[in-house]
Amino acid sequence: MKFESHHLAYCTNIHPAESWTETFHVLKTDVLAVRDRVASGKKFAIGLRLSAQAALELLENDQLDQFESWLAQENCYVFTINGFPYGAFHGTRVKENVYKPDWTHMSRLVYTEQLFTIISRLCPAESGGSVSTLPGSFKEFGADENLIFANLYSCALTIETLAKETGKDLHLGLEPEPLGHFENTEETLAFFERFFAWCGSEKLDPNPIKNHIGINYDTCHFALEFNDCHQSLRTLTEAGLRISKIHLSNALSFDPQNPKALEAIRPFDEPTYLHQVI
């Protein structure tokens, strides 16, 4: 859906689906049911979550052509893909594994480039297309930052090529979150400063980074870091960083001295997902 100059999409990552067959089934059932409730008769934007398996399968044979036809038939469109979770995201222990493989691994690069091949086909020229991804790595992994920089730069070059071929504005959004390689406004600025410094030391053109790599701003994650949304976004944009996408999500606020509050949040102490608390 479009509101003035911005597009709002329904993100499908809440629906369990790992293969393309499972993903397409979710789109044809659950997602269309949501569309009919909130945007009946209107053009409906889908924020598509694709696992590495689903992305590979979608690129086989004529699957992508069929999906494009289905989107047109259902008056839907895709302008963004959630490329953070590479593998299983439901029904198993996810937690820090959601960061695997991280940006030190070639498999993360290949997967993300496949997502850009897909989004470059699907997204309208008017909106452009984005893919969101993890903030390089998980803090506790102690990742080699130079490998992160090298793989991200390679991805930026691929995005640049696809953007020129399609005439569409394409960009990757790194998503800061608690315990990520960078997790708040200050660390995000510092990461990009090091990224550009690395680029200079390697005598590489910084424009692919400036034009095609930005921030996927999750309102819940930054709230957990006690970063004021307006000030944080202003600081990032004034530093010349692109806001690739904004995830509208909520953080819970409670009194840690209140026994009832502690009891109410106890169910979140479960083995599947990270539930960051600050």
Question: Which residue stretches match the model-derived regions?
Answer:
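Conserved strand-to-helix beginnings and helix N-cap segments that scaffold or border functional pockets
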Residues: 21-24, 58-64, 145, 182-186, ...
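Active-site acidic/histidine proton-transfer and metal-coordination neighborhood
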Residues: 92-214, 224-225
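Residues at the N-termini of beta-strands
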Residues: 78, 130, 243-245
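Short, solvent-exposed polar/charged micro-motifs at secondary-structure junctions
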Residues: 54-59, 89-93, 182-184, 224-226, ...
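Active-site beta-loop-alpha junctions enriched in small/polar residues
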Residues: 11-15, 49-53, 83-86, 134-138, ...
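Active-site capping/gating regions of soluble enzymes
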Residues: 11-16, 122, 188-198, 208-278
